[in-house]
């Protein structure tokens, strides 16, 4: 099965239709080569900083393959992904203008010889948002292919039409009907967060890089409290829309002084539903 692709600058109706029908879509030519090259370099630098701060042993115990969390803390380059017009248009259309970033994770997926990739959560079939709410879309993922997604590089496997299902499909069905989302570097891969998917297995002989974003309605807790993790000063340096996505307008008060504030100073602003 060929991945569902729509051309950049096309009507959002096509993206919405693909999400409704099969649960995912690919938008090509979003990032140019200069941006890709800069992002690759910066991801490796962030990986080194995380390794230094957390330590190889603790990272190994987590049972992850090349996951980079909280990249914005280590390099402001990664804030710019929250300003990309295609990202904002999809988030606004599928969720809401008040949606927030649940996570931004980089992936430097290492290569292994065939049949020797460790079994971890990433390459088991799963949903990023395991809650089906009677057709109510509460979460959407937007992943950037920083390197080409192919069978050999470990393109993400998706099971078309498996989204918005209350019961988990049989594992045999998932394995037999999964298709790799193959796309060029610079493409954007968007999917309903209830879609069953798994990381592919990279046997290409080199790393494969990607960045995944998950956006939710503002009343769902983030994987990381980005406002606290980054600090008020850093968040306030960002554009207003980025502040919104980071959760600046949906913070939880901690005392009565914070609670009894005028509308323009409240931590949890009106209309964040």
From Swiss-Prot:
Which Pfam families does this UniProt record tie to the protein?
A: PhyH
Q: Which GO terms describe its molecular function?
A: 2-oxoglutarate-dependent dioxygenase activity; iron ion binding
Q: Which InterPro entries match?
A: Phytyl_CoA_dOase-like
Protein name, as recorded: Uncharacterized protein Mb1539
What family does this chain come from, according to its entry?
Belongs to the PhyH family.
Domain of life assignment: Bacteria
């Amino acid at each position: 099965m060929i991945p569902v692709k729509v051309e950049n600058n096309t009507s959002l109706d096509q993206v919405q239709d693909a999400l409704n029908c099969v649960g995912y879509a690919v938008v090509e030519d979003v990032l140019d080569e200069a941006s890709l090259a800069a992002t690759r370099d910066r991801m490796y630098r962030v990986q080194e900083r995380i390794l230094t701060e957390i330590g190889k042993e603790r990272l190994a115990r987590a049972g992850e393959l090349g996951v980079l969390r909280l990249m914005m803390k280590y390099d402001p380059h990664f804030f710019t992904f929250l300003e990309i017009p295609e990202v904002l248009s999809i988030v606004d259309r599928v969720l809401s203008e008040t949606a927030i970033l649940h996570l931004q994770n980089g992936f430097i997926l290492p290569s292994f010889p065939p049949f020797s990739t460790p079994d971890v959560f990433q390459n088991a079939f799963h949903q990023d948002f395991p809650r089906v709410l009677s057709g109510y879309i509460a979460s959407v993922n937007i992943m950037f292919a920083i390197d080409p997604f192919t069978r050999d590089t470990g393109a993400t496997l998706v099971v078309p039409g498996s989204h918005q299902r209350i019961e988990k499909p049989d594992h045999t069905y998932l394995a037999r009907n999964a298709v790799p989302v193959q796309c060029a570097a610079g493409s954007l891969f968007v999917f309903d967060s209830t879609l069953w998917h798994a990381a592919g297995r990279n046997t290409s002989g080199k790393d494969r890089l990607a960045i995944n974003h998950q956006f939710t309605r503002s009343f769902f807790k983030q994987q990381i409290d980005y406002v606290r993790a980054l600090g008020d000063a850093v968040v306030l340096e960002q554009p207003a829309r980025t502040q919104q996505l980071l959760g600046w307008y949906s913070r939880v008060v901690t005392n009565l002084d914070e609670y009894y504030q005028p509308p323009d100073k409240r931590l949890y602003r009106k209309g964040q539903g």
